[in-house]
């Protein structure tokens, strides 16, 4: 029942739908009380020979009319109630996605994709089912049960009613006991389903790698273990679930036995008539649904409550990155980076230390260094993916902490080494951040990224479908489409995180020439590269090693110093000459 309190915010919001449903249900309950009463009166009249068969027909017609009206009202009631519950599904999923979109990278490091998908789909469905069927069952069984109970006590016999309901307290105690067990067991089952969902997602994503390494049997064994564990936990839920029905049916059977035995004795003593006993048995039949519904409601509500706990545990987490309130009107500002110390969560060793540099509008900053030196970490801090422990990053003399996250990220375009493309057309992938972009704008961005000539050679040109994650394209083509996508946004700062690694030297040179024309308009460019040829024309290059800057200057200055940059540049130059030989 805790779930109804947890969802009261939605019930208040949709109070008109729920109030309308309750009013219709009260009318339905009143109408359903009439047939047993009518039949009881008719039986007594027939026994006393005060009514002929012909005179019964109008009363039968009334009973049929009541049945038709009840059917129509129940139809309207369900439309109102389930319409509200389906709207809840939409709101919960939008709220869930909205929360995820505001989270930083650390959140996704802690939470698996498959688990988040399970919470956004399966768990939401359980909550919605409880908010629909659960509310329906609660209100229906409560109104009907109370109404029937009042009629049985006031119109027939309070003594017979009390005797017939002796099994009910025992049933209520058992249902409550099983309900608590069901809540805990179902939550474990949902966690197992999340793990299964995540494993399925990982297998489907990496199926080509699994085949390439011949890991089919190994992955099948691993997947089979997870499936069996999930099935075992679901079986535990089913075992507890199976205890509800026997309790209900035994209680109902015992109630009927007591009603017939005690009712027969009351008729024998002329306390009630046969017609009233018949009405009582029919009313007791109407009580069966509330009793069955009570157990079923506890079942689905406990499942819904467990699912809500899983959803709420995600959306109730505090945001790791707090949003600022400031925006800057002036365009093309100066970026100042002053990082004294940065640690990744749970790491004792700093990932970055003593990083101090500036980037003026229209300039290019090159970043290089050994693998794992902290280059991508620096870019993540510029994007506000993590908090800086000591130090700050300024834009136009304003700390990034003061700026609204959405505003700041609209100022920067980022292209990563692994480019993600959606299963859509090339045109739609390029215009992802600017859906209303004209074809001319899309082609202009594609030309800057040196991908236009490749696109026009495809059978469907810009309308070519790239497949899931761009599987129909080469690595270099995907990178260039991602660059075009970022260029289309005309952001003040463009960040290329080793985004030229999959293109050949000639294509790289063409892109860099185009980017030089682009940044001359006042835009800033940050290039992270392992291939140092991409950094030759940068205004400043920094070399990061073990989280700190060990060299800085332009290309001409750095190749004169005997250090990491010159050593790596000479090595790559010789390697290129050998490849071209």
Swiss-Prot record:
Gene Ontology terms: cellular component: plasma membrane
ABC transmembrane type-1 domain ranges (all copies): 18-303
Catalytic reaction annotation: ATP + H2O + xenobioticSide 1 = ADP + phosphate + xenobioticSide 2
S-S bonds: none
InterPro entries reported in the protein's UniProt record: AAA+_ATPase, ABC1_TM_dom, ABC1_TM_sf, ABC_transporter-like_ATP-bd, ABC_transporter-like_CS, P-loop_NTPase, Type_1_exporter
Bilayer topology annotation: Multi-pass membrane protein
Domain ABC transporter: 337-571
The protein's name: Multidrug resistance-like ATP-binding protein MdlA
Family: Belongs to the ABC transporter superfamily. Drug exporter-2 (TC 3.A.1.117) family.
Organism: Buchnera aphidicola subsp. Schizaphis graminum (strain Sg)
NCBIfam families with a match to the protein in the record: PRK10789.1
């Amino acid at each position: 029942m805790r779930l109804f309190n947890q969802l009261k915010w939605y019930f208040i919001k949709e109070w008109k739908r729920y109030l309308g449903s309750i009013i219709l249900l009260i009318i339905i309950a009143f109408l359903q009380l009439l047939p047993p009463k009518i039949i009881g009166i008719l039986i007594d009249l027939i026994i006393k020979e005060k009514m002929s068969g012909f005179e019964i027909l109008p009363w039968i017609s009334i009973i049929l009319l009541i049945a038709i009206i009840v059917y129509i009202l129940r139809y309207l009631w369900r439309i109102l109630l389930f319409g509200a519950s389906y709207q809840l599904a939409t709101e919960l999923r939008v709220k869930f996605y909205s929360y995820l979109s505001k989270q930083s990278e650390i959140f996704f490091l802690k939470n698996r994709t498959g688990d988040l998908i399970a919470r956004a789909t399966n768990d939401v469905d359980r909550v919605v089912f409880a908010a629909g069927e659960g509310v329906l069952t609660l209100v229906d069984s409560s109104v009907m049960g109370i109404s029937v109970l009042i009629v049985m006590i006031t119109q027939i016999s309070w003594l017979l009613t009390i005797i017939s309901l002796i099994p009910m307290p025992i049933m209520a105690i058992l249902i409550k006991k099983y309900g608590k067990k069901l809540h805990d067991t179902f939550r474990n089952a949902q966690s197992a389903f999340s793990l299964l969902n995540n494993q399925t997602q990982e297998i489907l994503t990496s199926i080509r790698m699994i085949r390439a390494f011949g890991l089919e049997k190994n992955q099948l064994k691993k997947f089979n273990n997870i499936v069996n564990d999930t099935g075992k936990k679901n079986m535990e839920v089913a075992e507890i679930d199976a205890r509800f029905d026997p309790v209900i049916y035994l209680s109902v059977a015992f109630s009927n036995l007591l009603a017939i035995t005690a009712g027969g004795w009351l008729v024998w003593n002329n306390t009630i008539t046969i017609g009233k006993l018949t009405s009582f048995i029919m009313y007791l039949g109407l009580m069966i649904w509330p009793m069955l519904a009570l157990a079923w409601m506890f079942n689905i509500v406990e499942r819904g409550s467990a699912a809500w706990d899983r959803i709420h545990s995600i959306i109730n987490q505090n945001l790791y990155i707090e949003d600022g309130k400031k925006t800057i009107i002036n365009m093309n500002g100066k970026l100042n980076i002053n990082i004294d110390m940065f640690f990744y969560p749970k790491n004792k060793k700093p990932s970055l230390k003593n990083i101090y540099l500036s980037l003026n509008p229209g300039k290019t900053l090159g970043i290089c260094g050994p693998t794992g030196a902290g280059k991508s970490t620096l870019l993540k801090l510029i994007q506000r993916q993590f908090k800086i422990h000591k130090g700050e990053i300024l834009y136009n003399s304003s700390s990034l902490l003061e700026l609204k996250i959405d505003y700041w990220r609209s100022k920067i375009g980022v292209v990563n080494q692994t480019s993600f493309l959606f299963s859509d057309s090339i045109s739609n992938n390029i215009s992802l951040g600017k859906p209303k972009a004209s074809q001319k704008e899309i082609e202009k961005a594609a030309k800057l990224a040196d991908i236009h000539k490749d696109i026009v050679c495809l059978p469907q040109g810009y309308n070519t479908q790239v497949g899931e994650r761009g599987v129909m394209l080469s690595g270099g083509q995907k990178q260039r489409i991602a660059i075009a996508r970022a260029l289309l946004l005309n952001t003040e700062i463009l960040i290329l995180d080793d985004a030229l690694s999959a293109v050949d030297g000639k294509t790289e040179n063409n892109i860099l020439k185009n980017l030089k024309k682009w940044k001359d308009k006042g835009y800033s460019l940050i290039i992270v590269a392992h291939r140092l040829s991409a950094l030759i024309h940068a205004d400043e290059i920094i070399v990061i090693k073990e989280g700190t800057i060990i060299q800085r200057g332009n290309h001409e200055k750095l190749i004169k110093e005997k250090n990491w940059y010159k050593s790596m540049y000479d090595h790559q130059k010789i390697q290129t000459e050998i490849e071209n030989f």
